[in-house]
Amino acid sequence: MRFLMFVAILFAVGLFLYRRRSFVEKSPAAQLTTGQIKQAWRELGFFCELDDRDRTWTLTGSRAGLLRFRDLLLAYVADPRHALQSEYEQYGPYGSLEVMTWPAAGFDGQSIRGSLPDLARLAGLVETKLAAAQPDSVLLIREEFAPDSAYTLRLDVRDDWFDPASADPDRLGAATKLPAPKTKG
């Protein structure tokens, strides 16, 4: 009986912390320069945007850039610190992309969440969908990962020279594409 009470209290505290964070406003890292913000998007490999109106998490990048999301998920799963419920990491220059350990898989207005096996499965889904993706295609993930989820993960696939910083709504990336590498001859 005491054990069940302890588990119920832990669950309530976890739920409280989870819900409380959704009310805390996320502010951009004011200390970052425009150049640092651009570089952070490029290092991440894709641009991330949450649209609460359309209930979508949109990741925009080249196939290689979007595969970094798969790698990010696999690294999250491999880190033993994330084994506990409510553990999370934030990514991107604004910390807007949040991956969270949670018993039920899903997408919501705060995070992309699930158990570690769920998040590993999501990484596999991303890899599988991107394997045959062509530039200018849009891939949706919800039914295969969390059919009851209110939000959808949208992968907006661009060409190989796409610059993720160019998708920032503040237009921090001036060019829409990175320059093509120079070829000999």
Task: Please annotate each region the language model reported.
Residues 1-8:
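Feature marks short, highly hydrophobic, charge-poor N-terminal signal-anchor/signal peptide-like helices
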Residues 8-14:
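Intrinsically disordered, low-complexity and often Lys/Arg-enriched segments
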Residues 14-185:
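Positively charged, low-complexity terminal tracts
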